[in-house]
Amino acid sequence: MSIIDDKWKLLFDRYDIEKKVSESGPFYITADQIREYKEPRLMTKFDTRESLPSVFGSRLGILPVTRGTYVIGDFDLYADFPEQGGPGNLVPGTRVPGVKKAAIPDYYETIDINDIRSEAGAINVMGISGILDDFLGGENFKQTVSGRMASGKFTFQVNPVRAGAKAPETYGINGYQIAVNNSQVEIDGGFEDRDTFAMIEGKNVVHSNFLIRQLYYPYRLWNGKLAKPVRPVFMVYSNNIFRLLEYEFTDSSCYNSIRLVKEGLYSLEDTDISMQDLREAWERTAVKPEPPVVFIQADSFEKVISLVEHLNDRALTPAEIAEVFGFRERQSDYYFNACRFLGLAVKEKDEERNVRVTITTRGRSLLKLNYKGRQIR
């Protein structure tokens, strides 16, 4: 159990939060109350379902409503990403295309396409390369806003996780009614052309699901300010691939009305792997005994590569890996074991005797390869 888990257990016990939510509906808690145990910024950042403290169980979630107040309740706050290349929850008539080739003009000398590590860097390259123009069918999108800002005032309804949940007075037709008043929101990138404002939420790590609030709060802010349509886009950059997913809110007053409109994959490299490439890889591969590694339980190879990319920046403890990927700490070992099986990472003790997962020479060599080289290797 992590420190965050421990602190939330103390808060739940002190304020009898679970019982109050069950009997009376949403429970409001202040930043000052949370700060008695740990910094609120660290205690309220749960970007995936799996990152929620265990005391929240499978139905409770937390949302900010002002600069200093949060609400805890039986809220359905997360949405699953579709399987990459799969149908997911697409609007009828749309499809997932293959990986499109993009390019950066050769006069940009400051950009190394083989060393795009940060979310901000990936968003910059996405704009410069014309990826966003192609994906949204726009013309010359330019970045106009980014960073933290106040949400303004708005109300919305959010659905409960469980069907048949007890309905207090604040329960509406579609869910609980929540009022937001100048909560802090953050936009990774806002791009505008003549007809559209595209709002980008960027990640450089692969997750299975995401917190809808990351798109919904900024969407409500800008949808209330602008005459032109606001198009929320989630961008994930990993393994040299830009994955863009456009969403829409079919009812702007309903948090859970989110729908996936379309998905696109882009790369600055050649990603086509031929049968000849595969045959050559097979012919030069020597058969070796399997290493003595426990049974591999990792279920996403994309996350394995994403972990190696993060280890290239610095060694990570299992707890830090769990924080980066937004899952339980035990799952850190699932993905470490997959990396270890492939010879990409090992566990070592640092000077303070803390166990850290460290990238191997083979892992660093892998990341120096282009997309095709990584997949074939």
Predicted regions and their residues:
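Extended, well-ordered protein cores
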Residues: 115, 249-252, 265
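Nuclease-adjacent, charged terminal/linker segments that flank catalytic cores
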Residues: 1-116, 120-121
